């Protein structure tokens, strides 16, 4: 009986004794580095050129295709990878050396941690007395425009854009003879914190 079962199993499995690895055991490629705008995912599109032109004009995930009712594995993994990048942007702090390199000193809202910043948005709109005092001592009073930087929900966006954006903005204001205040960085800041900043420094626009 045992021999019959063994033969039956061999017939069903086709006598397979070893299984080849499904993927190369080498380094797994970083899916987040793939340019989705240049990737043609739809099989046999009616107009491949226009499809790629449309994808090049938007960051939306167009034409990801499917396997039955589900996303393809590569599409799903790319979505998870992008989600991980977004999570890192939220939970990672802007490095102090980056602030120093861009001439920004740091103050903090009434939030004491990233968790509190995410769960208590009201505290991210408020400055404590020590922060207000620091701003008044380090910043120009009553400027026409007060420019400051804040992490909000993406430290990555700060690092990617501020080195180009901040100097251009300050130069543009100066060229129009608009007085700008001393730039600085607000950690754990919500949009409403600008009202507190304007009140502390007496700026016309923040």
Regions found by a protein language model. Name each.
Residues 127-131, 164-168, 186-194:
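Active-site glycine-rich loop that binds ribose-phosphate moieties when present
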Residues 19, 176-183:
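Flexible, glycine/charged-enriched surface loops at secondary-structure junctions
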Residues 155-177:
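Glycine-rich phosphate/diphosphate-binding loop of Rossmann-like nucleotide-binding domains
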């Amino acid at each position: 009986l045992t021999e019959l079962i063994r033969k039956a199993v061999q017939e069903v499995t086709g006598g397979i004794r070893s299984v080849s690895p499904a993927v190369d055991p080498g380094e797994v490629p970083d899916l987040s580095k793939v340019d989705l705008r240049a990737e043609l995912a739809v099989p046999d599109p009616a107009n491949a050129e226009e499809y790629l032109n449309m994808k090049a004009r938007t960051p939306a995930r167009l034409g990801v295709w499917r396997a039955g009712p589900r996303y393809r594995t590569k599409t799903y993994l790319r979505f998870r990878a992008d989600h991980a990048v977004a999570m890192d942007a939220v939970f990672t702090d802007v490095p102090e050396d980056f602030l120093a390199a861009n001439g920004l000193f740091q103050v903090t809202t009434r939030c004491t941690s990233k968790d509190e910043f995410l769960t208590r948005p009201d505290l991210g709109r408020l400055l404590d007395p020590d922060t207000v005092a620091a701003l008044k001592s380090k910043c120009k009073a009553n400027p026409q425009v007060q420019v400051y930087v804040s992490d909000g929900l993406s430290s990555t966006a700060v690092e990617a854009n501020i080195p180009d954006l901040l100097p251009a903005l300050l130069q543009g204001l100066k060229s129009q003879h608009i007085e700008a205040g001393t730039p600085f960085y607000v950690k754990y800041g919500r949009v409403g914190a600008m009202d507190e900043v304007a009140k502390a420094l007496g700026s016309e626009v923040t």
